[in-house]
Amino acid sequence: LRELLGVKFRRLLSVHPENEIYIDYEDETNGKSGSLPVIPIFPQYVSNDQDPPTPYAEDSFEIEGDDGAVYEVEFERGTLDFDAMTSELADDYPGLFTTSGRFRTRFRPNQSKQGVDIYANGRILMTSVFTDLFDLIRNNEYNYFGGEVRIFPKEGTTEVPTDNKKVRVDTNSTLWQNLCEILSSDEYQPEGKRYD
């Protein structure tokens, strides 16, 4: 839960030093209780000097949505540096990691976790989005690919369209359809690492 909240609310937690989330707990087996801080968890990328499969890049562009609304989109991506991400937090927050020193949920080098996070309306709405955005099939070549798509309303609206529960971008919206079309172009496709 701590890692999930640290991923979903990473921008909120890092905007102002007074923004905090704590998880209070009580262990019913031994009566111990305590409080754990939620730490913002951002992706970090392998330097382009190291010739990663997907070089680090950042782009921004505008997309039109329903009823003529305009959105500013920022797309950051690259090859994730899992070692840098864990070593930065391991000493102060060892409970965030498995005994092998990896994150427990979002940032793991496997097929189900590859892809980008979608930021809109003040938080991460979707994580590990891959096949819905890119014209590719998940396979081990993309295990280290990651990034973030940030969507900001610019004209004609104050919010990004979401589903009824407000927990994900409305994938039936014109905004989403246009975003998928743009990110499926060769310019934005991730590069995979072949394991021979």
Set out the residue ranges of the language-model regions:
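Glycine/threonine-rich ATP-lid/beta-loop region of ATP-binding domains
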Residues: L1-F107
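Charged regulatory segments coupled to nucleotide-binding catalytic modules in large multidomain enzymes
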Residues: E58-D196
